[in-house]
Amino acid sequence: MNISFENKVALVTGAASGLGLATARAFAESGASVVLADWNEKDTQSAAMELANKGHKTLAVRCDVSNDAQVEAMVKKTVSTFGRLDAAYNNAGIQNVLADTADTTREDYDRVMGVNLRGVWSCMKFELQQMRKQGSGTIVNCSSLGGLVGGAERGIYHAAKHGVIGFTKSAALEYASRGIRINAVCPGLIWTPMADQMVAAGQGEALKMMEKSIPMARVGRPEEIADAVLWLCSDAASYVTGQSISVDGGFVMR
């Protein structure tokens, strides 16, 4: 994409792999100074070093987004290092253990909600505190196809992703007149380490069936989500806020 983020600062959570890493690379290649945040410190450092070796300005931060103190420290480190925060992609997320609603556990509920919903809330809270000081900024939250439809044995994950859309719309209303735009992306079936985990867990056939139900008849690439995120964060989307953009090969239009 021919979008420039020169002299801008971008923060990406879940940046050690998958959608987060692809988006961090895209921001860097578009000229942004990029903060890569993830709980996996080793892989985050490696990703940041990969970009730095190509001449990009990067910062690696270890952050568990379910920990408010770590999220606050992440945003403070971003600002103390680069002076501001212009764009944020709140991408960190995990899957739930497959189970009917009656068989789910409180432990799994708390674990998934802590990262996928509370984590997004916490990131937005501290990002917005900085952005309202500046009077500008853009945030993109990672929801999912699961934020638009139901999913058997995935109730916790889908509930969290529905919640992300609710937070996105509410915060967008609060900040629309203050120079801050907030949107969400809803990825469909994208080949990422999370998809690899599903195959390893014996869900390979389910993935194949999902692929067959995609009108475009293929699995998406992480870079296609990164393109959507960068567009939403750019001036090209200056009149877009509170939206949940599906990037799913047409799955939800069936």
Give, region by region, the residue ranges found by the protein language model.
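Short, small/polar-rich loop/turn modules that mediate ligand/substrate recognition or access, typified
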Residues: 176, 181, 186, 240-242
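Alpha-helical segment proximal to the catalytic Tyr-Lys
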Residues: 129, 173-177, 238
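Residue(s) in the substrate-gating loop at a strand-loop-helix junction
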Residues: 144
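Short C-terminal tail/terminal secondary-structure segment
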Residues: 2-4, 95-98, 149, 230, ...
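Substrate-binding pocket helix/loop in short-chain dehydrogenase/reductase
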Residues: 99-101, 105-111, 206, 210
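C-terminal substrate-recognition "lid" of short-chain dehydrogenase/reductases
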Residues: 82, 121, 128, 136, ...
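Active-site helix of classical SDR
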Residues: 124, 160, 168
